[in-house]
């Protein structure tokens, strides 16, 4: 305890025990259910109930094994990187990406937990993952099933459409809302609402570290503006070409996007 502990951490078990006591006494709640890491907190509540209300007072605890990822960390919001069912907090695209990026070591387990696929289907996907992991068949099926279950067929199709567009670079048919979903975590920049030469634009938005590098990447065909490859050093980035008048999308290389406002 060289650095001490917070008041919240110090009182957590006490407050949870008191909470269980009041729920038991005032509302007749007899059982508390939690993850296996909550065993001590739950039994503290049971002990408090028995001391204050008598040893014969019905009070029980039930714990469920924690779902751990292959690296041993918890699968949950307290461990960071969790997803929400609410599309306002986690968009269908983000939700889909979360599942499609699961580790090969976890994906079969998640298919069993979170989908209604038959044992035969899951075993077939497990075999495909073992033989051809680069195809990510199990991850794609997991993402498809869970996204459809939570966000419906429309949410799944939108997530797949955004995924395919960003992967291929063909973003012209995406709406502004879909672009914002897909590039929510991409680098962003702001520039003045004026026409600029492509080289100056790339440097001003810090997409390129120097004009020399910008010229080189443009000439080599590494720069895409709103989905189109631009190789002319005379090209002008015009605000009028922005998506819905809001964004110019720059792609450098295969999939390095920047959202420019």
What are these regions (language model features)?
Residues 1-63:
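Divalent-metal (Mg2+/Mn2+/Ca2+)-assisted nucleotide/phosphate chemistry catalytic cores
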Residues 49, 53-261:
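Conserved nucleotide- and phosphate/pyrophosphate-binding catalytic cores
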């Amino acid at each position: 305890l060289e650095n001490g502990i917070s008041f919240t951490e110090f009182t957590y078990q006490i407050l949870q025990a008191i909470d269980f006591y009041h729920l038991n006494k005032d509302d007749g709640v007899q059982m508390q259910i939690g993850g296996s890491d909550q065993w001590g907190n739950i039994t503290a509540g049971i002990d408090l109930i028995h001391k204050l209300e008598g040893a014969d007072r019905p009070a029980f605890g039930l714990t469920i094994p924690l779902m751990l990822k292959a690296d041993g960390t918890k699968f949950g919001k307290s461990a960071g990187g969790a997803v929400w069912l609410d599309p306002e907090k986690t968009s269908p695209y983000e939700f889909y990406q979360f599942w499609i990026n699961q580790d090969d070591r976890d994906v079969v387990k998640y298919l069993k937990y979170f989908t209604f696929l038959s044992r035969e289907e899951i075993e077939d996907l497990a075999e495909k993952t073992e033989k051809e992991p680069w195809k990510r068949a199990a991850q794609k099926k997991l993402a498809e099933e869970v996204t459809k279950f939570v966000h419906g067929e429309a949410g799944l199709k939108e997530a797949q459409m955004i995924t395919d567009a960003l992967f291929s670079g063909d973003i012209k048919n995406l709406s502004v809302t879909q672009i914002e979903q897909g590039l929510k975590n991409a680098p962003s920049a702001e520039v003045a609402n004026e026409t600029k030469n492509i080289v100056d634009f790339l440097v001003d938005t810090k997409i390129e570290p120097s004009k020399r590098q910008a010229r080189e990447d443009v000439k080599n065909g590494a720069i895409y503006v709103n989905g189109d490859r631009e190789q002319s050093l005379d090209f002008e980035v015009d605000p009028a070409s922005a998506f819905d008048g809001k964004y110019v999308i720059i792609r450098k290389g295969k999939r390095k996007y920047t959202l420019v406002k």
